[in-house]
C-alpha cells in the first residue's frame, strides 16, 4: 500500500451483500466526488469479466466483490449516473467500457487524472505510481497487479492492493484539480473528456476492423476480402466470447484474404487454421463471408485512404520541422507532446491543406495547430536563441 502510515486511510471494507452496497452508495452520493477503479479479467474472453469495483470516499473505501452470489449492483449504476457526484478515475477507458456494458451508460460527470496529468505537463500517459509518488509522496505496491481477480476468496493482500488505488487517487485528483484550476486549464481537461464521454469511443465496428491491420496494398479486391474476413472474426469472437487472436491470428487473416479459399480443404491449408476449425461452424461461416465478398461489385470494394497511399507520403523534412515546433510548444506550455498532436496529425498536417485532426481544434489549435499551419505555409520559420526555439515571421 503506502510507505506512509496506513492510518492515513480508512480500512477497506469488503462488500459482498446487496444491503451493504446500497448503504455504501447512499453515503457516497452525499459527497462531491468519489474515486473509482475496477479489477477485471480479459485474457481468456472477448468481453471483460468484471471481478471487483473499488469506491473511495472521504471517510470510507470499499472493495466490492462483483462475483458475490446474488449481489445487486444497481446502486453502483445509480451512483455512476448521479450528476451531483464527480467520478474520478485514472486511465478510465477500460473502466468506462466495462460500466457501459454493465449499466448501458457512461458515468457522468467524470474526471480522468491521466488526462489531467498530461495537461499539467507530466508527459505522455504518465504511470499512476509515478503520479502518486510525485503528488502525494505515497507508494503503490505492484505485487498484485497481475492477480487472478476471478479467484475466490480474495486475499487480504488483494483487498488492500485494490483499496490503495482509490485511496491514493483522492490526493492525486485534488492536487491536479487545484493546479489546473490555478493555471486556467480545467477547460482543456473537459475538452479531452468529451471523447471519453462519447459512447462511440467504446464501440467496435466489425466493418472497419481490417484497417487495423494496415495492409500495404491497394488492391481493392483483396481489401474487400480482408474487410469481410476481419468483420467475420470480430462477430465470431464476440459470439464465442474469446479473444480475437485466439480465434484466428492476424497473419492468418492476411493469408486467407490473399488465397481466397472456396472450401474447407483449401481453408485448412492456411497458416494457423486446422482441419477441425475449417470443417466446423466457424469455418463454414468464414467461407460464407469469403464467398459473399468475392461476389461484390467493384463499386462496393474498399480502398486505402489517399493519405496512406505512396503518392501522398509527407515530406520528411516538413514532418521534422513540425516535430521541432511540437517539442517547443510542449515545453513552452508544459503539456505532453502527445496530447497536442499525434504522429498521424503531423503526417496529415504535412500532406493536406487543413486536415480534420484534433491538433487543429479547440485549445490545441491555439497552442500548436495555428502555428503549425503557418510554418507549413511559409508564414513563419524557426530560429534558435540560445537554447530556445523562436518563431520568426517571414516576409
From Swiss-Prot:
The keyword Lipid metabolism does not apply. One of its GO terms (biological process) is tRNA 3'-end processing. Belongs to the RNase D family. It holds the Pfam family DNA_pol_A_exo1. Its cofactor is a divalent metal cation. This is Ribonuclease D. Its EC number is 3.1.13.5.
